[in-house]
From Swiss-Prot:
Protein name as annotated: UPF0147 protein MJ1419
Alphabetized Pfam families for the sequence: UPF0147
Organism from which the protein derives: Methanocaldococcus jannaschii (strain ATCC 43067 / DSM 2661 / JAL-1 / JCM 10045 / NBRC 100440) (Methanococcus jannaschii)
Alphabetical list of NCBIfam families matching this protein: PRK04330.1 (NF003319)
Protein family per UniProt: Belongs to the UPF0147 family.
Amino acid sequence: MVFGSAASEKTPEEILKGVALMLDEIINDTTVPRNIRAAAEKAKEAVLKEGEEPIVRSATAIHILDEISNDPNMPLHTRTQIWSIVSELERVK
């Protein structure tokens, strides 16, 4: 078993598709306030936007999520999800 090999690295597109799935969890969670779900939807659209480089799509989504990450109405589990999503997006090169 080889750790850290290039074969186990995800491509930027794979990372972005995984992030879109993670954002779907927030979008479909009715316990999350509407403004936060709307921002998650906006971030998902940015991540899946065709015609832009993956790094640009990632940076746009990070910016959107960063703006809402300190919302006092955000449930704690959602804040944790957003931090995880941002960590994934930061891996895109």
